[in-house]
């Protein structure tokens, strides 16, 4: 592997920490869901909707966020999004009803859109053989979710109010938005910014972008869904306290986060598609374990899924800049949007199934079946063609 460009390490540090701050703000509502449930007397479906809504905007907003990063640069875009995300976070601290929480939850989802900005910003600092590792390290910003899940309940107890927690995280978001603007810099590039119509044309004519979106729907969507819903699931299914459930969820997030750069490094060495074969096969088996109602079996399944999802996230984002070097932000926006949507629907489905059957088992059966479907798509789109001929971006019209 070649030496990094001068300034690349600094850029990676600032993008990763900014992503962690954004992800922490994005995850606050889910982290404090047990508190809101008790405060407002929510049903399982109402609680699931509250958890899922921030994920929706955080998903759909990634496509335009990625386009903005490609056009105006990640430095400006990331700084602005960090500053704007602080507004709904602070407003939730002032809210006093479930309805207000839902509306503000839509806007706090803005923090989740910054993921696409960071991928575009980071990828431009590294050569193709470094991008899997670099984006895997950037993806460790997922630890922001762990900070929210574990830190928010602890801070709420320390301050004696959940409202103060939102004010604290809003202040951190503002601080890091200013820091990013002052000290982070865009990589020098000769690539001419693309127009909106050109961005849309890339998405329409590149089926590979949609295949990668499907894969990220499974890997990152699975990660987000479990990260935001585990506190509720553990409390409902296994009668854990909010603090214990938060600690276990933080462990899940931490493991998935640490495995993401490993997935990127393995993808640099062996190819992202080959790594994804193992990931999807593992998820199909681990989903079955998580459907079991016994704590030890569930724990093995959840920790195994954390490792597999982390590896998968790193592998997918090795493939994005590899096949779309000029449109990384735009394609990342699409792929990231699907990944976020993969985190939006499962909590809703789990809530409905819990109310209908009294269990979450059927939801994990769906996870296993979906992973098997992705396994088949990966084989026919990537590996089968690799056996026939050397795969190149031109094979997909990229």
What are these regions (language model features)?
Residues 137-184:
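Helix-loop-helix hairpin linking two adjacent transmembrane segments in secondary transporters
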Residues 270-316:
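C-terminal transmembrane helical hairpin of 12-TM major facilitator-type secondary transporters
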Residues 1-6, 185-213, 396-398:
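Juxtamembrane intracellular "pre-TM" segments in multi-pass secondary transporters
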Residues 132-150, 336-346:
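Glycine-rich segments within core transmembrane alpha-helices of 12-TM secondary carriers
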Residues 41, 73, 94-99, 127, ...:
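Helix-breaking motifs and short loop linkers at transmembrane-helix boundaries and internal kinks
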Residues 29-33, 207-261:
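Extracytoplasmic gate region of multi-pass secondary transporters
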Residues 60-98, 267-270:
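Conserved MFS/SLC helix-loop-helix module at the cytosolic interface between two early adjacent transmembrane helices
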Residues 104-141:
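Cytoplasmic helix-loop-helix junction between adjacent transmembrane helices
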């Amino acid at each position: 592997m070649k030496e990094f460009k001068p300034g690349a390490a600094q850029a990676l540090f600032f993008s990763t920490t900014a992503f962690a701050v954004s992800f922490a703000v994005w995850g606050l509502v889910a982290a404090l869901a047990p508190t809101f449930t008790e405060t407002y007397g929510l049903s399982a479906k109402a609680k699931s909707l509250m958890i899922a809504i921030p994920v929706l905007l955080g998903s759909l907003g990634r496509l335009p966020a990625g386009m903005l990063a490609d056009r105006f640069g990640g430095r400006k875009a990331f700084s602005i999004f960090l500053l704007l995300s602080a507004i709904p976070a602070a407003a939730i601290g002032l809210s006093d009803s479930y309805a207000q929480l839902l509306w503000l939850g839509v806007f706090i989802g803005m923090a989740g859109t910054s993921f696409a900005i960071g991928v575009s910003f980071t990828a431009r600092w590294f050569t193709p053989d470094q991008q899997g590792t670099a984006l895997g390290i950037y993806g460790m910003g997922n630890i922001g979710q762990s900070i929210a899940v574990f830190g928010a309940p602890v801070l709420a107890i320390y301050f004696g109010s959940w409202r103060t927690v939102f004010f604290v995280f809003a202040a951190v978001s503002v601080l890091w938005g200013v820091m990013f603007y002052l000290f982070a810099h865009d990589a020098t590039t000769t690539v001419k910014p693309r127009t909106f119509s050109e961005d849309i044309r890339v998405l329409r004519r590149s089926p590979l972008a949609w295949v990668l979106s499907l894969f990220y729907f499974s890997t990152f969507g699975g990660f987000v869904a479990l990260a935001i819903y585990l506190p509720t699931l553990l409390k409902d299914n296994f009668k854990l306290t909010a603090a214990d459930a938060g600690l276990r969820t933080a462990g899940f997030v931490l493991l998935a986060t640490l495995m993401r750069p490993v997935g990127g490094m393995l993808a640099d060495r062996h190819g992202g598609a080959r790594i994804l074969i193992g990931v999807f096969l593992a998820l199909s088996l681990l989903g079955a374990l998580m459907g079991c109602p016994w704590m030890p079996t569930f724990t093995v399944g959840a920790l195994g899924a954390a490792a597999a999802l982390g590896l998968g996230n790193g592998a997918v984002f090795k493939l994005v800049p590899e096949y779309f070097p000029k449109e990384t932000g735009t394609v990342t926006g699409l792929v990231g949007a699907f990944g976020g949507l993969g985190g939006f629907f499962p909590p809703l489905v789990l809530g409905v199934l819990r109310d209908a059957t009294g269990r979450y088992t059927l939801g994990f059966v769906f996870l296993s079946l979906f992973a098997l479907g992705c396994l088949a798509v990966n084989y026919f789109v990537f590996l089968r063609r690799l056996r026939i001929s050397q795969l190149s971006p031109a094979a997909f019209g990229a």
